[in-house]
């Protein structure tokens, strides 16, 4: 493809390489390092004048360092006269801080949106935003892609009893997501109402729906410490589910997450590779990964060529 340059930040170079290969491109030359005082240094190693630039950087790992690196890369390309800069952010950072849910709480997702715009981003490509209204925090175009088509494909190919399954949301906020998947699989859905006393701790769970003698498939956009999904798995098994799977777009897996998954009764915990999972998979044999590089690559190709990306909302590109 002419007049396109693809750069990778430090957060997930394996995913960036897969996207580049699917597009038939080589990653652009960029050197990122830290000065002795820990300031981030970025050197763009090739001309981007008049080019359509895409920078892949996921909001994971050292999140603050990686976010700062992305902002500097965007700005470096912008002031080097690129025609357009698109930030490809598979897992959007600070997405859970999307509203003022208590006194004096910051809306940090809005701040991140402002920072990306001020740095010079012309367009954002992301996946399964924690709250879709985050798109409204931007005054530039945002394409929020969905892992759902890839999830549906994985379910059909890897769960033999999927026709006798029930799709379960671990909280009321995910009801729209699970009803969409359940409708497309032509199966029932259920949800779990949870009461939180403080962040990352669930006090009580109430199951709404009948899971008896069915394969329960928990679906959520992300899992962090995994307290919610592990409690949910116990709840589903005690309610008569024959097996429990968890399918998540963003597997953050911080703190006690891995030990909790190892001790929980999951058949598998399936995540996409918006976040690197190689180290976690070595620690937990239950973790499986869905590759979404083809979705990002096709979104980049369609954006570069001025085509619609809505096809990707319901199809997995080859």
UniProtKB/Swiss-Prot annotation:
Entry GO MF terms: ATP binding; kinase activity; magnesium ion binding; protein homodimerization activity; ribose phosphate diphosphokinase activity
Q: Which residues bind ATP?
A: 96-101, 130
* Pathway the protein takes part in: Metabolic intermediate biosynthesis; 5-phospho-alpha-D-ribose 1-diphosphate biosynthesis; 5-phospho-alpha-D-ribose 1-diphosphate from D-ribose 5-phosphate (route I): step 1/1
| Documented activity regulation | Activated by magnesium and inorganic phosphate. Competitively or non-competitively inhibited by ADP, 2,3-bisphosphoglyceride or GDP.
PROSITE patterns reported in the protein's UniProt record:
PRPP_SYNTHASE
Q: State the reactions this protein catalyses.
A: D-ribose 5-phosphate + ATP = 5-phospho-alpha-D-ribose 1-diphosphate + AMP + H(+)
Query: Which residues are listed as membrane-spanning?
Result: none
- Listed binding positions for Mg(2+) are 128, 130, 139, 143
Query: Could you tell me which NCBIfam families the record lists for this protein?
Result: PRK01259.1, ribP_PPkin
What HAMAP family does its record include?
RibP_PPkinase_B (MF_00583_B)
* SUBUNIT field: Homodimer. The active form is probably a hexamer composed of 3 homodimers.
UniProt-recorded name of the protein: Ribose-phosphate pyrophosphokinase 2
């Amino acid at each position: 493809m002419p007049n396109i340059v693809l750069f990778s930040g430090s957060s997930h170079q394996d995913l960036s390489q897969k996207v580049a290969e699917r597009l038939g491109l080589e990653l652009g030359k960029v050197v990122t390092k830290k000065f002795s005082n820990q300031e981030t240094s970025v050197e763009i190693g090739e001309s981007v004048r008049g080019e359509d630039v895409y920078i892949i950087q996921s909001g994971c790992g050292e999140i603050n360092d990686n976010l700062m690196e992305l902002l500097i890369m965007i700005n470096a390309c912008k002031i080097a006269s690129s025609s357009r800069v698109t930030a490809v952010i598979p897992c959007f950072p600070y997405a859970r801080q999307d509203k003022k849910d208590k006194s004096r709480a910051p809306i940090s997702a809005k701040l991140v949106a402002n920072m990306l715009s001020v740095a010079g981003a012309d367009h954002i490509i992301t996946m399964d935003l924690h709250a879709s209204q985050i798109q409204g925090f931007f005054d530039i175009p945002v394409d929020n892609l969905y892992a759902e088509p890839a999830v549906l494909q994985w379910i059909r190919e890897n769960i033999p009893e999927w026709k006798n399954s029930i799709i379960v949301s671990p909280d009321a906020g995910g009801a729209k997501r699970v009803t969409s998947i359940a409708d497309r699989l032509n199966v029932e859905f259920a949800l779990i109402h949870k009461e939180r006393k403080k962040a990352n701790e669930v006090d009580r769970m109430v199951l709404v729906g009948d899971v008896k003698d069915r394969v329960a498939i928990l679906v959520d956009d992300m899992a962090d410490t995994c307290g919610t999904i592990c409690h949910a798995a116990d709840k589903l098994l005690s309610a008569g589910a024959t097996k429990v799977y968890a399918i998540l777009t963003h597997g953050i897996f911080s703190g006690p997450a891995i030990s909790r998954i190892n001790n929980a009764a999951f058949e598998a915990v399936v995540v996409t590779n918006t976040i690197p999972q190689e180290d976690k998979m070595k620690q937990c044999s239950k973790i499986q990964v869905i590759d979404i590089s083809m979705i990002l690559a096709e979104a980049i190709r369609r954006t570069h060529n001025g085509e619609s990306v809505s096809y990707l909302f319901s199809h997995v590109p080859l």
